[in-house]
């Protein structure tokens, strides 16, 4: 019985809440020019169910939780906190109208996704990939010739192997004067045209590229 209301138990409009709601109505009336308009997202973030299923079924990497969803959400959250709007797409979606395509942990490359990614990059788009990209095709068969399969040329690198970091384990890398902790996975890659931006600091792959 004591919940708030625009018109409270007093029964009249001479209250703070009523005045604020009235002011809000006046403000909304001034926004007719933007009603119905949209701001198209320039960034597309890939969340792909078939890739998720393939990862969850893979008898390798971490058998408890491979953290595909968490990896996608980490990318989403980082952009959302900076006010960047995104379209959530899957690998079969049309992403040609975007400037940036982010495809975290794309273990499975379905259909012509890799081809369309390459065309997207050739047309000036920016493609962001992570560890664990391009290991199997849409029949869940490993790509021959090295990972990330058909994206090797596009990304300008060859992934030799991937190391799983157990909970609590970290490696580190420095970028622009800041030192970052690396968790979950560490992929050993060899640049084949890609520019190395940061390198691992520890373990047997110290000095190898961590970010290109």
Residue spans of the language-model regions?
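Carbohydrate-binding surfaces of carbohydrate-active enzymes
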Residues: 1-212
């Amino acid at each position: 019985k004591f919940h708030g209301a625009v018109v409270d138990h007093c029964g009249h409009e001479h209250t703070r809440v009523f005045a604020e709601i009235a002011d809000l109505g006046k403000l909304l009336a001034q926004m007719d020019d933007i009603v119905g308009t949209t701001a198209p997202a320039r960034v597309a973030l890939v969340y792909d169910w078939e890739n998720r299923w393939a990862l969850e079924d893979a008898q390798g990497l971490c058998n408890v939780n491979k953290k595909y969803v968490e990896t996608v959400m980490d990318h989403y959250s980082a952009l959302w906190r900076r006010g960047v709007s995104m379209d959530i797409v899957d690998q079969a979606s049309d992403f040609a109208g975007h400037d940036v395509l982010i495809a975290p942990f794309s273990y499975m490359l379905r259909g012509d996704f890799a081809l369309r990614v390459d065309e997207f990059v050739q047309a000036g788009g920016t493609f962001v990939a992570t560890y664990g990209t391009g290991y199997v095709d849409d029949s869940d068969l490993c790509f021959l010739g090295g990972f990330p399969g058909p994206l090797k040329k596009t990304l300008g690198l060859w992934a030799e192997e991937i190391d799983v970091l157990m909970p609590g384990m970290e490696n580190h890398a420095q970028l622009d004067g800041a030192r970052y902790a690396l968790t979950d996975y560490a992929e050993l890659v060899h640049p084949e045209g890609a520019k190395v931006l940061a390198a691992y600091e520890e373990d047997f792959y110290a000095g190898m590229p961590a970010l290109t």
